[in-house]
A protein has these predicted regions:
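Hydrophobic helix-and-loop "lid/oligomerization" segment in the mid-to-C-terminal part
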Residues: 2, 10-129, 148-149, 200-403
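Generic detector of well-ordered alpha-helical packing
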Residues: 79-83, 135, 158-159, 174, ...
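Short alpha-helices
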Residues: 89, 164-205, 209-221
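Generic beta-sheet signal
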Residues: 104, 133, 156-158, 172-174, ...
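Short gly/pro/ser/thr-enriched loop/turn and capping motifs at secondary-structure boundaries
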Residues: 110-111, 139, 159-164, 178-179, ...
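Catalytic PLP-binding core of fold-type I/II PLP enzymes
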Residues: 143-162, 224, 233
Length: 403
């Protein structure tokens, strides 16, 4: 058992509810008891309403205006799986509404989040509106720069708010205190889905929403957010769609990795988290995350097969890097030699580390020692370092770094 494991005492079991659910859903008592003790729900209906998130009304009004006037919309995303699925979801949904839309995902070397060079590039391409997904909540300078260019910005993000809210046209984040919606742990793709939900509700297209939930499920599982409340509902409903997914690229990928039963097997969060998501993640780590987005949005089956071959090749390269695991081995050796496990925070830095896998290594170090962990790639020529951080329950590493 892992040291410092957090024990959670069971709730006082509501046996009246258990008997009711057993009658209605024919559940085993043990399963129902586990569901009750974990505060889970069997309900798969979402808990949100149209404008439960602050600025949702402003965002949808501006998007409808852009669609009506055929204005150029760019979706700006992150290069991890949450960002990839967020971009794909919003691109597909806006395209269906008739929007003039494209997407931009920075290369990993550009760094996480918004950057001024990219914003200038989008402005030069006569972009009228940028919608960020899975990034932007702390990009105050970048949004100020966009305002100077008269470039409208809608931020959709789920990360911690570390200071003032950027002065974008609209800022949608489940962690905003002004929200009516009380659940604060949406993934980026869940936040993007809330925007799509609001748009489609106003267009009387709610029946067209369900088909997107497999994309939402992949991003939600990959981002390791708590699978409770609406996150659990996204995943539960989305996993059931994978057998009959309407997205040609996803269908081709599932056929490739589950050749015997892709269309009949029952999919679990494990399949997404450990088999499907790493294939998309490898694109952002080693190549260009736009490859992964193209698999979601491409309608030509032959092109999809070519994209899949490249993604699988990237994933093999990623696995080989991890198997060699020089970074993990070097990190563990340094931790043990210097007894860093006795400190409140573990920090390991080296110029030979590869930025594409330091996040994976940080997660493995966290699992091994259960201490907040920072793994850094030192870029000697630039005089900076790139880091990935992982933390334990009860320690907000963002607040620690800002203090």
């Amino acid at each position: 058992m892992k040291k410092n494991t957090k024990w959670i005492l069971e709730n006082k079991t509501n046996y009246e509810k258990i008997f009711e659910n057993k009658r209605e859903k024919k559940l085993d008592f043990i399963i129902e008891d586990l569901i009750e003790n974990r505060n889970l729900s069997l309900d798969t209906n979402f808990d949100f309403k149209l404008f439960d998130l602050k600025d949702m009304d402003i965002a949808t009004q501006r998007i409808f205006e852009a669609i009506k006037s055929n204005q150029k919309i760019y979706i700006y995303g992150d290069y991890d799986v949450d960002g990839i699925t967020s971009v794909s979801l919003l691109y597909l949904a806006l395209s269906e509404l008739g929007a003039n839309v494209d997407y931009y995902i920075p290369l990993r070397d550009e760094g996480y989040g918004l950057n001024k060079e990219a914003i200038q590039t989008l402005k030069n391409e006569n972009t009228d509106l940028v919608i960020s997904v899975d990034c932007g909540i702390n990009s105050i300078e970048e949004i100020n720069f966009a305002n100077e260019l008269n470039l409208d910005f809608i931020i959709t993000d789920h990360h911690e708010i570390t200071g003032d809210i950027p002065k974008a046209l609209a800022v949608i984040n489940s962690k905003r205190e002004e929200n009516i919606y009380s659940f604060k742990y949406l993934a980026g793709v869940g936040t993007a889905f809330m925007l799509v939900y609001a748009l489609y509700t106003q267009m009387n297209k709610l029946n067209d929403l369900e088909k997107y939930l497999d994309i939402v499920a992949i991003g939600t599982v990959a981002d390791i957010v708590p699978l409770v409340s609406d996150n659990r509902k996204f995943v539960k409903r989305g996993l059931k769609l994978l057998n009959t997914t309407k997205w040609i690229g996803i269908k081709q990928l599932l056929r490739k990795i589950f050749p015997d039963n892709w269309d009949t097997k029952e999919y679990f969060a494990y399949d997404v988290g450990y088999i499907i998501a790493p294939i998309f993640n490898a694109a952002g780590r080693l190549e260009d995350a736009k490859q992964a987005v193209s698999l979601f949005v491409e309608e030509d089956g032959f092109k999809c097969l070519s994209i899949i071959d490249k993604l699988l090749e990237n994933n093999i390269e990623r696995k080989n890097m991890e198997r060699g695991m020089s970074i993990l081995e070097m990190s563990v050796t340094e931790i043990e030699k210097k007894q860093l496990y006795n400190k409140n925070l573990i920090l390991v830095a080296n110029k030979s580390f590869h930025h594409g896998v330091i996040g994976i290594v940080a997660s493995k170090i966290l699992d091994k020692y259960y201490k907040p962990t920072i793994i850094m790639e030192i870029k000697e020529n630039e005089g900076v370092a790139t880091a990935s951080c992982r933390s334990i329950d009860g320690v907000n590493i963002v607040e620690c770094l800002n203090s």
